[in-house]
From Swiss-Prot:
InterPro entries: MADS-box/MEF2_TF, MEF2-like_N, TF_Kbox, TF_MADSbox, TF_MADSbox_sf. The gene is MADS3. It comes from Vitis vinifera. This is Agamous-like MADS-box protein MADS3. Residues 85-175 form the K-box domain. Expressed in flowers and seeds. PANTHER family: SERUM RESPONSE FACTOR HOMOLOG.
């Protein structure tokens, strides 16, 4: 009669757990030895009991197998880091060379360090300068045209604003004239005859003097000669006439 299937869970009985550990440990160590002998494999087995006791097996030595394991696991990562470092170094070298080339080209464009250049290189440099000059002139012309268009647009806006202000001023002038006409006496007399208005004199000095009534008073100023008697006679006649 065969044994039943063992349920995989922690054995609660301490004695049974220790017995099972001893049996399974010995069997595992035996299987590791058989695998190394039968298959010519390098096998390393490390076991720690629940009490911390170490059990190990190594066909070529546990330490040697662990060192080999570390080399296999960590060497590819080191190789990747080395490859990445090499790639960055090459990239930095390319950027440095490009930077130096740009600096050299800038000096040539400024007319510096032209001695080492050949005739062909000088011709290419001349073409580059001519092209750059043409582009600069074209850009300058374009900017001037844009500025002129902007000034024309502002001029049109100011002209329209001036026209609007002129029309507004004319309208206000017409309104002011209408108000002045409504308050003009001649216009008011012509418009409404039921309310006669006497025209005012523009200059008070132009008005004729009103007659002065003299009652019982005469300012006499004595004078010499015959004019005195004549004047007195005239004044006497004036008084007598008024009394009568």
């Amino acid at each position: 009669m065969g044994r039943g299937r063992v349920e995989l869970k922690r054995i609660e009985n301490k004695i049974n757990r220790q017995v099972t550990f001893s049996k399974r440990r010995n069997g595992l160590l035996k299987k590791a030895y058989e695998l190394s002998v039968l298959c010519d494999a390098e096998v390393a087995l490390i076991i720690f009991s629940s009490r911390g006791k170490l059990y190990e097996f190594g066909s070529a030595g546990t330490t040697k197998t662990l060192e080999r394991y570390q080399r296999v696991c960590y060497t590819p990562q080191d190789n990747n880091m080395e490859c990445e470092t090499q790639s960055w170094y090459q990239e930095v070298s390319k950027l440095k060379a490009k930077y130096e080339s740009l600096q050299r080209t800038q000096r040539h464009l400024l007319g510096e360090d032209l001695g080492p250049l050949s005739v062909k290189e000088l011709q290419n440099l001349e073409k580059q300068l001519e092209g750059a000059l043409a582009q600069a002139r074209q850009r300058k012309t374009q900017m001037m045209i844009e500025q002129m268009e902007d000034l024309r647009r502002k001029e049109r806006q100011l002209g329209d604003l001036n026209k609007q202000l002129k029309l507004k001023l004319e309208a206000e002038g017409q309104s002011l004239k209408a108000i002045q006409g409504s308050w003009n006496p001649s216009t008011a007399t012509a418009g409404n005859s039921s309310f006669p208005v006497h025209p005012s004199q523009s200059n008070p000095m132009d008005c004729e003097p009103e007659p002065i009534l003299q009652i019982g008073y005469h300012h006499y100023v004595p004078a010499e000669g015959p004019s005195v008697s004549k004047s007195m006679a005239g004044e006497s006649n004036f008084i007598q006439g008024w009394v009568l």
